Design a protein with these regions (language model features):
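Localized sequence-composition bias
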Residues: 1-112
Length: 112
């Protein structure tokens, strides 16, 4: 349940306005864990011109141990794809607990 950051390096051959950046996270068995993009998050309009990078900082990654893959997308607000990378990278999550399921819920036991 540690902070997690995704950095996407890009090189735009020409200036692109109103670019939406998106990610999707899948477990190794292709269970869809999470997805978001800058349009969903009401981010400001993004313009790409030349080279740079985009950082997505995730404050908590409360998934259980396992292998996960991340899809990356750059598209217009109307859905026209500039670029899409299926399984652009993979991540191994390790936990000290042996919980089961998809996520690790923050919890306390209170036995009286």
């Amino acid at each position: 349940d540690q902070p997690f950051q995704i950095r996407i390096d890009y090189k735009a051959e020409k200036k692109l306005d109103d670019v939406v950046f998106g990610i999707a996270i899948y477990r190794s068995d292709q269970v869809y864990i999470y997805g978001t993009n800058t349009l969903i998050d009401y981010s400001t309009s993004n313009t790409l011109d030349g080279e740079g990078h985009i950082d997505l900082k995730i404050e908590r990654m409360p998934v259980n141990a396992g292998e996960y893959s991340i899809d990356l997308a750059f598209h217009r607000p109307d859905g026209f794809n500039y670029d899409f990378w299926r399984e652009a990278c993979s991540v191994t999550i390790q936990n000290v607990k042996n919980e089961v399921g998809v996520i690790s819920l923050s919890h306390k036991w209170d036995v009286q």
